[in-house]
């Protein structure tokens, strides 16, 4: 198995509050292209992510769309039970729909949230059960992904563990590429 851990910013950290936000289109475009590249090179066959609102859920949505073209499995992992319990009804429904679409879902803890140790255990689990990672993250703009990024760097000290970073410059390039591709598709002259 060749397993990829995908994580990154939460939706609020990117000021994305709607599924119709153009930034979301660009993020999914960038993730889809990244996944396709790894799939075509035979470097992954599982895309594994968390359930946080933002990059993690969007990555799984993009991966699920690729299952029509590629032989890739998807997994949604949570650090504790009842992960979405405090979310509003709409976000809980999105989470539920996602759990029904992925190939595998589980929690790394058998208990609801009790302590930050569950989050550390989740990071350890993800590192030990994946072969590489990608983060949509910019070290110049730290946020929640900073903790996963630091855990990955520490893990790399004793393990071969490739990590790719898609930063804001990469997203800007993806936005320009997306715009160019769609301008050509819509050019009727």
Curated annotation (Swiss-Prot):
Q: Which InterPro entries match?
A: YspA
The organism's superkingdom is given as: Bacteria
Please give the Pfam families that the UniProt record associates with this protein.
YpsA (PF06908)
**Coiled-coil segments on the chain, per record:** none
Question: Which family does the UniProt entry place this protein in?
Answer: Belongs to the UPF0398 family.
**NCBIfam families the UniProt entry points to:** PRK13660.1
Q: What's the name of the protein?
A: UPF0398 protein LGAS_1023
Q: Which organism is it from?
A: Lactobacillus gasseri (strain ATCC 33323 / DSM 20243 / BCRC 14619 / CIP 102991 / JCM 1131 / KCTC 3163 / NCIMB 11718 / NCTC 13722 / AM63)
């Amino acid at each position: 198995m060749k397993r990829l851990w995908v994580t990154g910013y939460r939706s609020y950290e990117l000021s994305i509050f709607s599924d119709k936000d153009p930034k979301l289109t660009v993020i999914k475009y960038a993730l889809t292209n990244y996944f396709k590249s790894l799939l075509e090179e035979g470097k992954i066959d599982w895309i594994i992510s968390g359930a946080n609102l933002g990059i993690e859920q969007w990555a799984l949505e993009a991966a699920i769309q690729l299952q029509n073209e590629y032989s890739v499995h998807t997994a949604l992992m949570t650090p504790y039970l009842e992960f979405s319990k405090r979310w509003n009804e709409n976000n809980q429904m999105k989470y539920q729909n996602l759990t029904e679409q992925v190939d595998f879902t589980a929690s790394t803890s058998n208990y609801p949230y009790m302590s930050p140790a569950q989050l550390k255990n989740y990071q350890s689990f993800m590192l030990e059960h994946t072969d590489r990672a990608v983060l949509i993250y910019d070290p110049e703009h730290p946020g929640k992904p900073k903790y996963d990024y630091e855990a990955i760097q520490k893990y790399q000290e004793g393990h071969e563990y490739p990590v790719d970073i898609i930063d804001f410059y990469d997203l800007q390039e993806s936005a320009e590429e997306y715009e160019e591709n769609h301008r050509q598709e819509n050019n009727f002259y």
